[in-house]
């Protein structure tokens, strides 16, 4: 990656896991962004060990040894997933026009940064594109001859976006009743099972029965008809499954530690901007499979299903 001069700011979202934070930071260190914006949640009041863990995670950032402007937005108290991530990204996009975003357990391939930077520039003024993601959940199957494809699913384990897109984030989901009652999800999703699945999730989110910022971001993108760019092969691995995780405790999850590949340049751009319906159907069936589950199960699934920031604290607040 040293032969590519990264110019895009990088935002890093951290909490209380210095071990995984250090691995993510090392990937960022190799990329050498000129600006690093760090968002950190505070310790949970009922977890005394959080104080030292949060300090240790923040200390990792002191390892910046390249020419870099480091900006920090650290909370002294625990805001929870929804409020910390959304307020942190509000700060990020008040500060910069566009950014590459990583959370504290998402390790990227070196070419992930160039992939994001080139596409941030390429689609900068194209309102149809809301998110550039480094995730590919096709599980090793090559689906297109191009470098990437367009999807409705804005996977967020390593992603990038612009201020122009993030401005539509609505943490209150104020348009949900109108979308629900007008059956607009059918127009968006087209398939009955997908509509049932996401109606249940969005209703629970609207009712504040989970603490997910990611579901709210997905809803915000969908009602703006925003597309996500997904690479033809996976560029980011989530290393946060297993011991120490709150909602990714299952080490054998199909989504845990998916292998990374390097992107080949120059990028081969698709000649049209159309959502790949068949690939989205595969993702729905293999990752977001519609089935009945309780709200307690929903709170455990939040962390990995939309690929969002660590839902640490949600389970403890519910107990």
Task: Name every feature range the model reports, one short phrase each.
Residues 1, 305-319:
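Short, basic, low-complexity termini and linkers enriched in Ser/Thr/Gly/Pro
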Residues 2-101, 106-305:
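An acidic/histidine-cluster motif and surrounding catalytic segment
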């Amino acid at each position: 990656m040293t032969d590519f001069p990264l110019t895009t700011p990088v935002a890093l979202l951290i909490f209380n896991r210095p071990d995984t934070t250090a691995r993510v930071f090392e990937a960022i260190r190799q990329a050498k962004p000129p600006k690093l914006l760090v968002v950190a949640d505070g310790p949970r009041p009922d977890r005394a060990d959080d104080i030292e863990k949060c300090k240790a995670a923040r200390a990792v950032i002191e390892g910046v040894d390249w020419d870099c402007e480091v900006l920090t937005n650290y909370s002294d108290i625990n805001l929870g997933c929804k409020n910390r991530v959304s307020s942190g990204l509000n700060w990020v996009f008040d500060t910069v026009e566009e950014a590459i975003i990583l959370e504290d357990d998402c390790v990227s391939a070196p070419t992930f940064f160039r992939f994001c930077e080139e596409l941030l520039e390429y689609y900068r003024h194209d309102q149809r594109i809301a998110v550039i993601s480094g995730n590919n959940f096709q599980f090793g199957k090559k689906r297109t001859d191009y470098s990437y494809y367009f999807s409705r699913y804005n996977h967020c384990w390593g992603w990038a976006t612009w201020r122009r897109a993030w401005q539509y984030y609505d943490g209150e989901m104020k348009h949900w009743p109108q979308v629900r009652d007008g059956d607009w999800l059918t127009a968006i999703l087209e398939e009955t099972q997908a509509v049932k699945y996401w109606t249940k999730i969005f209703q629970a989110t609207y009712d504040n029965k989970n603490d997910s910022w990611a579901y709210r971001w997905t809803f915000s993108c969908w009602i703006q008809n925003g597309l996500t760019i997904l690479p033809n092969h996976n560029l980011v691995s989530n290393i946060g499954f297993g011991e120490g995780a709150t909602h990714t405790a299952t080490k054998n999850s199909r989504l845990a530690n998916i292998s990374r590949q390097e992107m080949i340049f120059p990028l081969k751009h698709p000649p049209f901007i159309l959502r790949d319906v068949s690939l989205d159907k595969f993702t729905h069936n293999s990752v977001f499979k519609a089935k009945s589950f309780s709200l307690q199960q929903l709170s455990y699934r939040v962390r990995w299903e939309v690929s969002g920031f660590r839902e640490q604290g949600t389970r403890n607040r519910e107990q």
